[in-house]
Amino acid sequence: MNNHSPTIGTRLYAQLVSLALWQKTIWVLAALFLLQAHTAQAASDRGLLLEAQKDGQTVYLLGSIHLADKSFYPLREEIERAYKSSDALVVEADILAMESNAALQMQVMQESVYPPGEQLKDNVSPEVYGQLLEWLNQRQIPEASFSRLRPAIAMITLSLIEMQARGLDPKAGIDRHFLSQAHRNNTQILELESVLGQIQMLNSLDNPELYLQQTLEQLSDMDSFVPRITSAWKSGDQEKIYDLVIREGLDEHPEYGPLYELLFYKRNQDMAKKIQDLSGQHNTLFVVVGAGHLVGEKSITELLEQDGFTVKQI
């Protein structure tokens, strides 16, 4: 088993909910890998659920895995009860609303690809593009499917395909589970970010070619990452989730510090501030964000505690 930490693309996909929208854009590709869904019951799995309270207001914080499988369900009764007792569902981005918004889908597509006449191979080294071609050949995916993708989007897309090949599915994601309920029952849905904003943030990364190359070189690490992150989430183990999503990557690649600052710590500050503001307008909120945002130093959880919330895992 490879002892390296999971690829940066894997970590990004696990934490950026908007990238589940690519299931529509590349569904033909994803269909190449039929998922083997597990049937084990999950009602006794703990999951990562925290309760934050301040001045009589309650905020439930559920750490999401944006790709999951049937073995995650049914969720623990306490999780479903917390959702049903809340006034509103708070998510990073409402991907279900986006799926019915053709104009937004077009904006996302325009942000994700190069303009006509410009291609991915023109913007990365021949070495990196050769690595991508080798992977495409192995997966029997046409080069044209990736030829105009921007580097960061290509990195996330191939990570999605590899994670799906290992049995995880965006349609089974924890956030999507609650969004489906909320849309069905007309529950108020509030967004901390936006789909388009997350895509634009990815495209603003410095040196995305480096992250694409690192992802291509360490794809085999997903073989160990998928069962490890699944186990960590089901047991509600905050330390293991932190190790997998953040600490191991920074220990192995300290040069990625600015990347983590942008994708985790800056976003944590922005999301924590918005949660604080929303909590003043509702008695009870049910917040679903990527699990990596709730664990460790400079997490949403820590920032809420600094603002006077009392937080406990339940």
Question: Where are the regions a protein language model picked out?
Answer:
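N-terminal secretory signal peptides that target proteins for export/translocation
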Residues: 1-21
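Bacterial N-terminal signal peptides
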Residues: 20-37
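Alpha-helix C-cap/termination motif
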Residues: 22, 82-85, 278-281
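Short hydrophobic "helix-edge" motifs at membrane interfaces and signal-peptide entry regions
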Residues: 28, 53-55, 280-281
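Boundary at the C-terminal end of the N-terminal hydrophobic targeting segment
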Residues: 40-44
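Structured, acidic catalytic/metal-binding patches in enzyme active sites
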Residues: 49-259, 263
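A cross-kingdom marker for long, charged
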Residues: 258-314
